[in-house]
């Protein structure tokens, strides 16, 4: 077993857990905040747009069962990579799409994948998802963890626009 981590920001972190959580080779997925300048921020602080943080998920995966490249491909299908200031109904810099990389290898994979997506002409607008070096990841409050299991009806409401976009662009 070779456990590695991936950090993806793609709008509301509630909507980013389930697509990864059920995959073979995923050990754990946690919602949290990263990319900012405030240590141990709270949800309320992040909502003020003054911390620099974005909502994200940190994924612990067994790279012998699922590759980082596969995770990046799954990530693209969960987001609108042409929207730099939020995702779907969630607006603002705390919902911006970012792939946070932990190594030069992850950066190379993410950049190659972004270039391939741009060249695919799947989207009419340019791909604006950022690729940034990973910064400290602060786990969100417990009530945010595994939200799709705790409140499936609310999760379904949050996911509606995302799922329609996915059906339109990826199927």
Curated annotation (Swiss-Prot):
Active site per database record: 12
GO biological process: protein modification process
Gene Ontology MF term list: L-methionine:thioredoxin-disulfide S-oxidoreductase activity; peptide-methionine (S)-S-oxide reductase activity
Catalytic activity: L-methionyl-[protein] + [thioredoxin]-disulfide + H2O = L-methionyl-(S)-S-oxide-[protein] + [thioredoxin]-dithiol; [thioredoxin]-disulfide + L-methionine + H2O = L-methionine (S)-S-oxide + [thioredoxin]-dithiol
Gene3D superfamilies reported for this sequence: Peptide methionine sulphoxide reductase MsrA
Enzyme Commission code(s) on record: 1.8.4.11
Record-stated family: Belongs to the MsrA Met sulfoxide reductase family.
Known function: Has an important function as a repair enzyme for proteins that have been inactivated by oxidation. Catalyzes the reversible oxidation-reduction of methionine sulfoxide in proteins to methionine.
Name under which the protein is recorded: Peptide methionine sulfoxide reductase MsrA
Species of the source: Leuconostoc mesenteroides subsp. mesenteroides (strain ATCC 8293 / DSM 20343 / BCRC 11652 / CCM 1803 / JCM 6124 / NCDO 523 / NBRC 100496 / NCIMB 8023 / NCTC 12954 / NRRL B-1118 / 37Y)
């Amino acid at each position: 077993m070779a456990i590695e981590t991936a950090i993806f920001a793609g709008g509301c972190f509630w909507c980013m857990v389930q697509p990864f959580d059920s995959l073979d080779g995923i050990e754990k997925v946690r919602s949290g905040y990263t990319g900012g300048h405030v240590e141990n921020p709270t949800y309320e602080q992040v909502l003020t747009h003054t911390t620099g943080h974005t909502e994200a998920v940190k994924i612990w995966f067994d790279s012998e069962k699922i590759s980082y490249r596969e995770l990046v491909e799954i990530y693209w299908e969960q987001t609108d990579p042409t929207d730099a200031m939020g995702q779907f109904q969630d607006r603002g810099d705390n919902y911006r799409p970012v792939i946070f990389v932990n190594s030069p290898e992850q950066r190379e994979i993410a950049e190659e994948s972004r270039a391939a997506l741009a060249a695919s002409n799947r989207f009419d607008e340019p791909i604006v998802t950022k690729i940034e070096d990973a910064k400290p990841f602060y786990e969100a409050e417990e009530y945010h963890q595994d939200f799709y299991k705790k409140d499936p009806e609310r999760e379904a409401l949050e996911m509606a626009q995302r799922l329609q976009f996915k059906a339109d662009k990826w199927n």
